């Protein structure tokens, strides 16, 4: 599918052009004829003979941006100056910082913020460790932990290259939920080492957000940390995705008039996200689900599963899905299905496959940047279509969930996170979309809807209290 110009590949080009003539119209024509989009044009200096103009341009890729620059370079009378990649400019020096809540202006301030006054606070915590939540940043802090092994669609790029993503995650925590999140990029991909490191740093945090850790190690790491720690551990790639998918599916079913217990769901992808989505859907009431991976439909008799370990994710899928014992390919499995959910690879389905689904079909094609099926083609026969992309309606985006989930967990001083809390989060997110707003192109709210984080946080907080998972200490 063609890729439209995006702000992700936005650049500002400084040009000098003749003050008279058609140079300005020529450069806008050159950009648009090259497939780019002029999003801003600012005159930064003017004279009788020359104009200096900063042109902001959206391209579809770095190669496309280079092509546009070369087109501009070829315009007669135009002198090309500095070309700035706006995304890289935003990352210069990092995107986040630590800031003090109290000014340190004199010796009195210094004596209370640091020595000697701080010693009294330290001793108070030593006598009552629970006071760390009340007297330190712990109560509002989340560690965003990665080993860089499964970063976005980039793969195993390592901890340093993963840092910009973790910084971005921390910025989103602050923007949408007021949470102080700290990027922790570990230079090891050893499961035991990661578990021990996170256990060692846990005293400084009220929650752990695991991020971009490859499957199947992510399952073991999360399970062991949940067992060992008295703070919630949440692998967002699994559970954040699952919560948003369930919320979107809830509203898609409202659009189509189908009941969750009566639908047949076919999923493509049995990795971290796929497994978590499946578990949450089953907990929400789905009775009939089939999963396919690169080897085809997952079923108990499949050759590669006969000797699979009982505790493995794929074995669990085989034991808990595909009640009809289907075999074969994804394309065969999707025939007559009510719902398709893809968390796998581009273009595994086509328009004919979607047309072969049940009436009122729901298609969630979430692979990025290229979905499992072209959304424009899927819309020709499906009743509701969602993707992971921001340039189509119904974007399934984890930003809708993780800030509110952790806000609720931290406010409740929860010691864990469980399925009931995630179900509550999904229901709250779905309910942000009112009956008057609901339609096939609006089943999930915008990340900038100011009701989202509060609604999710409130639901998670109440679910944590109901589960008896909260600490007994009070906060001022």
Regions found by a protein language model. Name each.
Residues 39-44, 81-83, 184, 211, ...:
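Flexible, glycine/charged-enriched surface loops at secondary-structure junctions
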Residues 1-92:
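A conserved regulatory-domain signal marking ACT and ACT-like small-molecule sensing domains
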Residues 152, 159-177, 229, 235, ...:
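Glycine-rich phosphate/diphosphate-binding loop of Rossmann-like nucleotide-binding domains
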Residues 80-83, 183, 209-212, 233-236, ...:
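General beta-strand structural signal in soluble alpha/beta enzymes
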Residues 232, 236-237, 256, 365-474:
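Adenosine-phosphate binding glycine-rich loop
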Residues 314-384, 389-391:
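Rossmann-like adenosine-cofactor binding region
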Residues 80-263:
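Glycine/serine-rich phosphate-binding loop and adjoining beta1-alpha1 elements at the start
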């Amino acid at each position: 599918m063609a890729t439209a110009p995006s702000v992700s590949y936005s650049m500002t080009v400084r040009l000098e052009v003749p003050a008279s003539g058609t140079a300005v119209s020529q450069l806008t024509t050159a950009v648009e004829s090259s497939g780019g989009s002029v999003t801003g044009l600012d005159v930064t200096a003017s004279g009788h003979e020359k104009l200096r103009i900063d042109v902001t341009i959206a391209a579809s890729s770095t190669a496309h941006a280079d092509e546009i620059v070369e087109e501009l370079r070829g315009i007669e009378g135009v002198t090309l100056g500095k070309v700035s990649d706006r995304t890289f400019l935003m990352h210069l020096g990092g995107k986040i910082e630590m800031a003090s809540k109290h000014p340190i202006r004199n010796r009195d301030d210094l004596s209370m913020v640091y020595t000697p006054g701080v010693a009294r606070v330290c001793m108070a915590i030593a006598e009552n460790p629970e006071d760390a939540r009340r007297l330190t940043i712990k109560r509002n802090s989340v560690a965003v932990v990665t080993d860089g092994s499964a970063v976005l669609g980039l793969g195993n790029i390592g901890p340093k290259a993963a840092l910009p993503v973790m910084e971005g995650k921390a910025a989103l925590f602050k923007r949408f939920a007021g949470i102080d999140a700290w990027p922790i990029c570990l230079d090891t991909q050893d499961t035991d080492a990661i578990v021990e490191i996170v256990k060692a740093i846990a005293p400084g945090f009220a929650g752990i957000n695991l991020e971009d850790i490859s499957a199947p190690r992510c399952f073991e790491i999360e399970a062991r940390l949940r067992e060992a720690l008295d703070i919630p551990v949440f692998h967002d790639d699994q559970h954040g995705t699952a919560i948003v998918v369930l919320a979107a599916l809830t509203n898609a079913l409202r659009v189509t008039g189908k009941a969750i217990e009566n639908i047949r769901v076919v999923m493509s992808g049995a990795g971290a996200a796929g497994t978590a989505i499946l578990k949450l859907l089953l907990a929400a009431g789905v009775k009939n689900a089939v999963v396919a991976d690169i080897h085809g439909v997952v079923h108990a008799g499949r050759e590669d599963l006969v000797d699979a370990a009982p505790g493995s994710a794929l074995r669990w899928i085989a034991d808990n899905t595909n009640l009809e014992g289907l075999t074969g390919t994804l394309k065969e499995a999707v025939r007559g299905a009510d719902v398709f959910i893809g968390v796998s690879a581009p273009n595994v389905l086509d328009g004919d496959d979607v047309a072969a689904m049940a009436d009122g079909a729901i298609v969630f094609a979430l692979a990025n940047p290229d979905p499992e099926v072209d959304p424009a083609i899927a819309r020709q026969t499906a009743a509701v279509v969602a993707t992971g992309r921001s340039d189509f309606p119904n974007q399934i985006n984890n930003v809708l969930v993780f800030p509110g989930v952790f806000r609720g967990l931290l406010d409740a001083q929860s010691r864990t996170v469980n399925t009931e809390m995630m179900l509550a989060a999904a229901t709250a997110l779905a309910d942000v979309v009112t009956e008057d707003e609901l339609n096939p192109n609006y089943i999930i709210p915008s990340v900038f809807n100011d009701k989202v984080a509060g609604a999710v946080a409130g639901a998670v907080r109440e679910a944590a209290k109901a589960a008896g998972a909260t600490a007994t200490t009070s906060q001022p």
